[in-house]
Amino acid sequence: MHDKTLTELAAGLRAGEFSSRELCQSALDRIQRLDGDLNSFISVTAEQALADADAADQARASGDAAALAGLPLALKDIFCTQGVRTSCGSKMLDSFVAPYDATVVEKIRQAGGVSLGKTNMDEFAMGSSNENSFYGPVKNPWDLSAVPGGSSGGSAAAVAAGLVPAALGTDTGGSIRQPAAFCGITGLKPTYGRVSRYGMVAYASSLDQGGPMARTAADCALLLETIAGHDVRDSTSVARVVPDYSAELDTSLAGLKIGLPKEYFGDGLDPEVETAVREAIKVYESLGAKVCEVSLPHTHLAIPAYYVIAPAEASSNLSRYDGVRFGHRCEDPTDLEDLYKRTRAEGFGEEVKRRILIGTHTLSEGFFDAYYLKAQQVRRLIRQDFLDAFDEVDVLMGPTAPTPAFDLGAQKDPVSMYLQDIYTIAVNLAGIPGISVPAGFAGNRPVGLQVLAPHFAEAQLLGVAHQFQQATDWHLKRPAFGKEMA
């Protein structure tokens, strides 16, 4: 069962080929046997999962099964889950148990989905390799010496290894799409505001967005239908009708206009990655699409702008972790200042401290105008680049990341790590949706094709990705890891 897609498992449950308990128990057995080598989960909620599976079986027997009834899933450990630890991969929240569910968690429960646990992540979603977790690095099931990408590396690795058929991640600068590419799965970052952020621990509030990670675009469509929608508890969520994404997958690509940003095919792009991506684009041409070159002239400014805006917002958001109300608290503080200093020094990891310092500096008097306001001006230029491009073409395509997954410990320099997100960060700054789909290999490591669409054009994005997956089999490839366990 572990090789099946989410939609295939849903069909199997409807046909009575197996029960939800059997399905969830099988997944839990794989997690127990295999995750010691991957470290993709922080918490596994086996007892609750089996109880939820039994409830789903009873609902199905009574003819009252919801859309995700009985399907096992995993949640990135950034989503609040009532009664279950929500750590954000940090010592600071190692003992924090949320008193409520995030909106997306609530929606998945209402749809009958069964959470098997919380997945590992870069601390507070700050990282591109999943090496910045208090709970240790996650390994890539395609090559255990490689990173899975980040910050949603636990979710990506768990899906790729067949521990769960799908998971939720979050994307602030590429944290769904880049690990999806590195692990050979499909990952969708929705339009900013399409999915509620209520109960999703904040990193950079104007950039964060939750989304699905799964085997296929069809799986992502099924999940997005469930988690998307307006939420009065999130002032940034948008009141727009949620389409039937699954019904719109079977779309013709004849006449589709594809733009290839020339800035995405320049220096720094691994030759094997470029070859795989260009071969994928040839598939689209064979399906009737038209391809042309476009320009996103401010792409080179995306990383510097992002690393002003995101740390500034993080500095503000993470100021609440001071040892007073919740989270880690240092022992025997001498006074309030000592409590603050030692709690934060002990509770945060190095990358989080680095970004807080950058953010505090950019927001400080004398630097706010020079850095933060300038970065916001650049952000508007980047957004306009995309709007201008979409006046000419329907979608944009290019590599998700400039290289395949790199070795654990290989990227020691923070700037070289930040450059891994060069093709994904601008998408968050502009707020548009993007999807990464498996498109080949560089050696034994997967390559992702990134497809971008205008704001709220997820239906088109998913349809374009689905048609590619109907014509290719890259999404059907599975790593050798765990194959011995049927």
From Swiss-Prot:
UniProt key word Acetylation: no
Domain of life per record: Bacteria
An annotated GO BP: translation
InterPro entries cross-referenced by the UniProt entry: Amidase, Amidase_CS, Amidase_dom, AS_sf, GatA
E.C. designation(s): 6.3.5.7
Pfam families found in the cross-reference section: Amidase
Gene Ontology CC terms, in alphabetical order: glutamyl-tRNA(Gln) amidotransferase complex
Gene3D superfamilies, sorted: Amidase signature (AS) domain
GO molecular function: ATP binding; glutaminyl-tRNA synthase (glutamine-hydrolyzing) activity
Active-site residues from the entry: K76, S151, S175
Designated name of the protein: Glutamyl-tRNA(Gln) amidotransferase subunit A
Catalytic activity: L-glutamyl-tRNA(Gln) + L-glutamine + ATP + H2O = L-glutaminyl-tRNA(Gln) + L-glutamate + ADP + phosphate + H(+)
Family of this protein: Belongs to the amidase family. GatA subfamily.
Annotated keywords: ATP-binding, Ligase, Nucleotide-binding, Protein biosynthesis
Gene: gatA
Assembly behavior: Heterotrimer of A, B and C subunits.
Annotated function: Allows the formation of correctly charged Gln-tRNA(Gln) through the transamidation of misacylated Glu-tRNA(Gln) in organisms which lack glutaminyl-tRNA synthetase. The reaction takes place in the presence of glutamine and ATP through an activated gamma-phospho-Glu-tRNA(Gln).
